[in-house]
């Protein structure tokens, strides 16, 4: 009997030591939170429910968010580095998998929208070749590529083909074929093949066939010196080359500069023929390969 009395007393004392309410607000024994679910109260009156963290008196959060201060909102894990920012691929010299916009954009915003529709970004490039454009850069703001001007520090307005004049700091307006006259600082207007005059600083106008005469500073209309400019007119296709092969009309392989100057198209052809090549006018001769070439005028 005495043994049973002692055992009953031990049993009763053990039962009283185990809390029966995990949410009594003052207990020190807290259940292990389920994975992804945490109930923590750090001040009197806290009564967390579900997966919450409470850090102030009288708080009673509901749902599954964490409160860290007034008017805070949970985030979805996305990060932003500033208004209007977007990720980039870090490629500043060439665009990969490029294509011409489906239709001519009327503004910078329209350009962006056209490219965004196919999951791409707008770029201004030099030479599109087989899906890869060489030497690309971001478009300038939201201005129209064929209307509104953009300028560099101290310069005049800037535009792409068919748009407004472009200049370098302190210079006169500059344009590509079909645009307005172009010049270097202090010089006369310069243009690509459209008959507009071209000059160097202080010189007289220079033009392609059918335009005005050509000169250098301090001289008046001297005879042409060097290669015949009528074969490869100034502009995009202005580099005379002797090339061995042509690929799809876009790239000429194994090209080299003519070994001597020529004054006629026939001389240009004969110089190239002596090394088994054909005369071409190219845009960008690079390491023996000229990209985008065409046949010389009158050859």
From Swiss-Prot:
The protein's matches in PROSITE patterns, at most eight in alphabetical order, are given as: PROKAR_LIPOPROTEIN
What does this chain do?
Answer: Aerial growth, conidiation, and dispersal of filamentous fungi in the environment rely upon a capability of their secreting small amphipathic proteins called hydrophobins (HPBs) with low sequence identity. Class I can self-assemble into an outermost layer of rodlet bundles on aerial cell surfaces, conferring cellular hydrophobicity that supports fungal growth, development and dispersal; whereas Class II form highly ordered films at water-air interfaces through intermolecular interactions but contribute nothing to the rodlet structure.
Give the signal peptide range.
1-17
- Please, which domain of life does this record's source organism belong to? Eukaryota
Checking SUPFAM superfamilies in the record gives: Hydrophobin II, HfbII
Which keywords appear in this protein's UniProt record, sorted alphabetically? Cell wall, Cytoplasmic vesicle, Disulfide bond, Glycoprotein, Secreted, Signal, Vacuole
Q: Which GO terms describe its cellular component?
A: extracellular region
Sorted alphabetically, which CDD domains does this protein's record hold?
Answer: hydrophobin_II
Glycan attachment sites: 39, 78, 91
- The question of whether Disulfide bond is a record keyword is answered with yes
- Where would you find this protein in the cell? Secreted; Secreted, Cell wall; Vacuole; Cytoplasmic vesicle
- Name the family: Belongs to the cerato-ulmin hydrophobin family.
Native organism is Beauveria bassiana (strain ARSEF 2860)
Give a yes or no for keyword Transport in this entry.
no
Q: What induces it?
A: Under normal conditions on SDAY medium (Sabouraud dextrose agar plus 1% yeast extract), hyd2C is up-regulated at transcriptional level during the first five days of incubation. Hyd1A is the most active at transcription level under normal culture conditions, followed by hyd1B, hyd1E, hyd2A and hyd2C in order.
List the disulfide bonds in this chain.
232-281, 242-272, 243-255, 282-293
What happens without the gene? Answer: Compromises aerial conidiation and submerged blastospore production. Does not affect radial growth and multiple stress responses.
Q: What is this protein called?
A: Class II hydrophobin C
